[in-house]
Amino acid sequence: MAIITLTSDLGTKDSYLASVKGSIYSQLETTKVIDITNEISPFNIQQAAYVVRNCFKDFPHGTIHIISVDDELSLKNEHLAVKAEGHYFIGSDNGLFSLLLSEMKAERIVRLNISQTTNCMTFATKNIFVPAACHLARGGTMEIIGTEVADFEIQKTELKAVITKDMIRGAVIYVDSYGNAITNISKEVFENAKKGRNLSILFGREDEQITAISTKYKEVPPSEKLAIFGENRLLQIAINQGKANKLLGLKLHEIIRIEFK
């Protein structure tokens, strides 16, 4: 059974998401539709890319991932289907794929040329992405639904941590539903820079400070702050049984410094 995942900013309040799912099942009753999340902040491609990048490998090869964020077609916002690491990704060329493909290699990219069966041009997810996904789920080939893109250029749109001799300077790139502030500082970068030295993790306007890396959230008492590497091997600032983003004022793009002595 083919699997199609949905990641979108459609929300669950309106009928849009139900229309997308109904369209999938109308075209291919035997598929399985799984929501990754439909609560992406409106037009936030960074958030969508982060979420998909962190979980797509948990799905079997051949899974088709529809990513519906800023999906309206324009000259600067074309629609693509990408095969990478054995998975298919369908979405808009609005910077999303530069973020997705920054750490993986695309096997094939096509520019979708599916003809709509409706005059409505504002719901590409339903009218273009869904037919493309169902075609692939049936075992169809990519050249049937699009023209080959041979010169796709990855735009460096994602912030990278800056490493110096005695410091790593990173930033918050995502805040999860628990209020954990996830940074762009990887465990590999951290371990290469630490070299057995003591550390201070500094953030916030009053230079909040953490001096150790925890391995579990409950290593500190409730309501205490901590730093921990999550399953995705990225450093996060958290509060045991609390919301770090609110209590520590950590927002997207907030600077996080790790100083070594």
Please identify what each model-predicted range represents.
Residues 6, 33-36, 67, 89-92, ...:
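General beta-strand structural signal in soluble alpha/beta enzymes
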Residues 15, 19, 28, 43, ...:
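Conserved active-site and cofactor/substrate-binding residues in soluble primary-metabolism enzymes
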Residues 118-185, 194-195:
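Anionic-ligand-binding alpha/beta catalytic cores of soluble enzymes and soluble regulatory domains
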Residues 1-76:
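N-terminal glycine-/serine-/threonine-rich phosphate-binding loop
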Residues 27, 44-48, 60-62, 67-69, ...:
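Active-site histidine-anchored catalytic micro-motif
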Residues 182-249:
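A conserved acidic, glycine/proline-rich C-terminal tail/linker
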